[in-house]
Curated annotation (Swiss-Prot):
InterPro entries: Bystin. Required for processing of 20S pre-rRNA precursor and biogenesis of 40S ribosomal subunits. Residues 1-45, 65-113 are annotated as: Disordered. This is Bystin. The gene is bysl. It is found in: Nucleus, Nucleolus. Keywords: Nucleus, Ribosome biogenesis. Residues 1-12, 26-35 have a biased composition (Basic residues). Pfam families: Bystin.
Length: 430
């Protein structure tokens, strides 16, 4: 026995014995403690940051609504209490395909976004003097839809007479899109029907769109539709949507309520994401019609003033408006575009100068808007006009005089350089 005890040896070293036993490892315990501590700190930081982010977002929202006239300053407490009672949104209801359907949640608390436009009666009378007397009758959105329906009936009758084998739209699809139209009539917020989102991808999207009766949509539905069509249509198709659906609805709303609904105003801002389609589908048709009202021009120009527009598109639309027959709305739009202070090509500047010089032989009393537009142009581009053009503008100031504005125009012209003076300076000999 003693020999056995003497010969008995450890199977392994001390390290192996320790590893084989269930000994607590302090390093792991410390690690877990550190992880729990980090989790608590992270959760505390996230909660703290969340409160700061929400507070800053609420402050920015209040500032924006005060700036745009969405509500008065005294309503801040009411709005804050209303927001706290609403709670957090249900994220499960948000569809991945939606483009921020609820990003304008504050809009649901008010019916209109743009406040009443104060219009001077005398200025409005002077404005109407320059409106086209032969302007075509303005069409409402309902008129456009009825015209489309009549054209479709004529097309179907012609196909039937020619015994065409072209497939017609399935009655089940017609029923589906009519149901979509019924939903859009009562739409306020939330997700749109998925069938509606497929319309821009259809070849006959225009026909399908008018099945939903856009003239009956709510303003919120039209805003969401504008977002979808701007994102999924090319410039030419978007121009059709703006001209046939958005523009008549905006004109009807302004004519009826003397102001523009908030959602329609935001739809205009969203439409400017495609500037070429916006100008060709909304702005230029309003100028060409000759019957654009003063309120319409002021509201549309406010959208232009608050949105960044590419220089080339701005130059093109200034050139087009300058070459049109004059109406009061032209002065408002030109003044807004001049105020952006873009570096315009000389061709556009020359067209703007000749736009004003056309009134040298006009004996009518020009509205204040025209004088304001001239002053803005001279202030921004006085050094980009030639000396001959400057002399012609000085002569124009003698023909059409405004007590307060014309002296400012003269002062800007006198105390400025001309573009040809800069090029005619002799080069210094080296």
């Amino acid at each position: 026995m003693g020999k056995d005890k003497k010969d008995r040896k450890h199977k392994g070293g001390l390290t192996e014995d320790i590893l084989e036993k269930n000994v607590t490892k302090p390093s792991k315990r410390v690690k877990h403690r550190r992880e729990r501590q980090a989790d608590s700190v992270e959760s505390f930081v996230e909660e703290k940051l969340s409160k700061k982010i929400l507070e800053q977002a609420r402050q920015q929202q209040d500032e924006l609504m005060e700036e745009y006239g969405f509500r008065k300053t005294g309503d801040r407490k009411t709005l804050k209490s209303a927001q706290t009672t609403l709670g957090t949104p249900d994220l499960d209801r948000i569809d991945d395909d939606d483009e921020d359907d609820s990003d304008d949640g504050a809009s649901m608390t008010s019916e209109t976004y743009y406040e009443n436009v104060e219009v001077d009666e005398e200025e409005e009378k002077a404005f109407e003097m320059f409106m086209s007397q032969e302007a075509p009758t303005r069409r409402t959105l309902a008129d456009v839809i009825m015209e489309k329906i009549q054209d479709k009936k004529t097309e179907i009758e012609s196909h039937m007479s020619e015994q065409s084998t072209a497939p017609q739209m399935d009655e089940r699809l017609v029923k589906v899109f009519k149901g979509v139209g019924e939903i859009l009539k009562k739409y306020r917020s939330g997700k749109l029907p998925k069938a509606f989102k497929f319309i821009p991808s259809l070849t006959n999207w225009e026909e399908v769109l008018f099945i939903t009766e856009p003239d009956e949509w709510s303003a919120a539905a039209l805003f969401q539709a504008t977002k979808i069509f701007v994102s999924n249509l090319n410039a030419k198709m978007a121009q059709r949507f703006f001209n046939l659906v958005l523009l008549p609805r905006i004109q009807d709303d302004i004519a009826e309520y003397k102001r523009l609904n908030y959602h329609l105003y935001m739809a205009l801002k969203k439409a400017l994401f495609k500037p070429a389609a916006f100008f060709k589908g909304i702005l230029l048709p309003m100028c060409e019609s000759g019957n654009c009202s003063l309120r319409e021009a002021i509201i549309i120009s406010s959208v232009l003033a608050k949105t960044t527009i590419p220089v080339l598109h701005s130059s093109a639309v200034i050139l087009k408006i300058a070459e049109m027959n004059y109406s009061g709305a032209n002065s408002i739009f030109l003044r807004t575009l001049f105020d952006k202070k873009y570096a315009l090509p000389y061709r556009v500047i020359d067209a703007a100068v000749y736009h004003f010089l056309r009134f040298l032989t006009d004996k009518r009393t020009l509205p204040v808007l025209w004088h304001q537009c001239l002053l803005t142009f001279v202030q921004r581009y006085k050094e980009d006009i030639s000396s001959e053009q400057k002399e012609a503008l000085m002569e124009l100031c003698r023909v059409h005089v405004h007590d307060k504005i014309t002296p400012e125009v003269r002062r800007e012209l006198v105390h400025s350089k001309s573009r040809d003076m800069e090029t005619d300076q002799p080069m210094e000999s080296t």
